[in-house]
Amino acid sequence: MLINLLPDFFAVLNSTDRIAAYLRYFDNHRSLLEAYWVNYVVEPESPHFSEVVKSAALAGRNDLRTMLERMDVVTLARNAEDQCRNLLEIDSDIDVVLMVGVGAANAGELVVNGRAVAFVCLEHFTSVANPETRGLGLDPELIPLWLSHEISHGVRYTSPGSRSEMKTHIQEANGFYSYWETGKRTTLRELLINEGIAVQVSRMISPGHASWEYYGYDRREYARIREMGPVVARSLIGNFDKTGLGLRLKYLSDGMSEDARRIGDYVLPDRCGYYIGARMVEQAMATRGAAWTVRASAAEIAAVSGEAAATA
């Protein structure tokens, strides 16, 4: 189901007291926005919450308004949702959310009370980098790419037919996904495959973009990760079945220190696991299809192609 929070956010911008209006907006959509803040920003109880709210509420939004005047983002989102429904044979409830965030993730996944959420934060998709909003300046044509990426996570986490480790951990947490808690309990193999599937699905739903855009890299980062692929693959040997938040952060996040990403004489590129994960699932996607692969266990996927070949 498509949920469009843009009208409510623009009501905040049109208010005479934007900060108070944002807090009302937060309360009106608390189950969704609290999960977004906890997973991608800061805890709402944190002393930094009010600072971030103030910055987001008072920021200029001319770039966003200009983009929305020329792009029908609702139709983009609906089309991506429909394509994913057909490709992935979706059989669980997934909310697709258009929203304006606070300059954190450009897109993301949540599970709230057992219901999956795939969201995009439109401040990042205006084609113009905006330091005031921390907007990345991505092309709005990339919205279907990122929505399909996140929708695939939603299927893997909540489909009745999913055999994924992520689904098991979310069920054990009473139907809630946490980047931090779920991440630290999940094996590195599952984390890599989870992101690799999302990359491959986004290629199928939104073809024609530069190769690096499917990973969230820039051209230079993509070249470096391809060059260092063998180093990254060797670093994974013996770690596939390990768990720990540090592994997720090392291979699948931005902003870790060089020391945290150091392997011998090398420093792993940020988010290098997306590239490796996409290679790990290529054979399964090609031979068994997207609908099977998105629900398959990591062991089933590894058995199709063989881990050694996928990460060589």
Which ranges hold each PLM region?
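Non-catalytic architectural context of zinc metalloproteases
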Residues: 1-74
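Auxiliary, metal-adjacent structural segments of Zn-dependent hydrolase domains
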Residues: 62-122
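Short pre-active-site segment immediately N-terminal to the catalytic Zn-binding motif
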Residues: 126-145
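Short acidic alpha-helical/loop segments enriched in Asp/Glu that coordinate divalent cations
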Residues: 161-170, 202-228
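An active-site-proximal "capping" alpha-helix that borders the catalytic cofactor pocket
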Residues: 192-206
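Pan-zinc metallopeptidase signature
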Residues: 213-312
